[in-house]
């Protein structure tokens, strides 16, 4: 029996990872955070001071892997769990640049497709429905206004030391949106057959339920 693949794409800060995890828990599917893979490559490149022209040759030594521990995705560089290290603003910006490099996308492409072929998955990223899983059973484009995304991120970081200002976060989101939408390789865009879910005025539970309804409607009709 064919495994069910759900693709969730959208801009930075739209809540893709959090909402996709909630949806996967409701449906019993494996959640795959592809952004974590790109962030890990960015961390590897940053830690080793690898210039762009040498990245392709260095990729086979990166040894990036996903492991599912107690139902939770963890990402590793070799035997080192770097799941926490890849969530800094610096690595976020580095990942936006790194993910535009064709060699990096090609390196991770096979990993993502293999996981999807072997499991019922909910996979989120920037080009899942358009490039990685073009034949996904259901495609969602999850978005929210830049201002709302910045506000959510600011609330997340407010209690942490050296928290950036709301305006700095908003500027960063606008910059990342531009980079992601205008890169030459696999730019961020909504797949023609994707369902748009705008969460600007929805909380997390409402967003997850909206997506579950779309999935159940589409999978039910297909069956």
Each language-model region and where it sits:
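Small-molecule kinase domains that catalyze NTP-dependent phosphoryl transfer to phosphate-bearing small molecules
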Residues: 67-69, 112-118, 126, 131, ...
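The conserved Walker
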Residues: 12
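ATP-dependent NMP and nucleoside kinases share a basic, alpha-helical "lid"
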Residues: 83-86, 90-95, 99-160
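Residue-level signal for inorganic ion chemistry
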Residues: 35, 79, 108, 122, ...
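Hydrophobic anchor at the beta1->P-loop junction of P-loop NTPases
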Residues: 8
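Conserved lysine of the Walker
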Residues: 16
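Hydrophobic positions on the alpha1 helix immediately C-terminal to the Walker A/P-loop
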Residues: 19
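N-terminal phosphate/diphosphate-binding loop that engages ATP/GTP or pyrophosphate donors
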Residues: 25-89
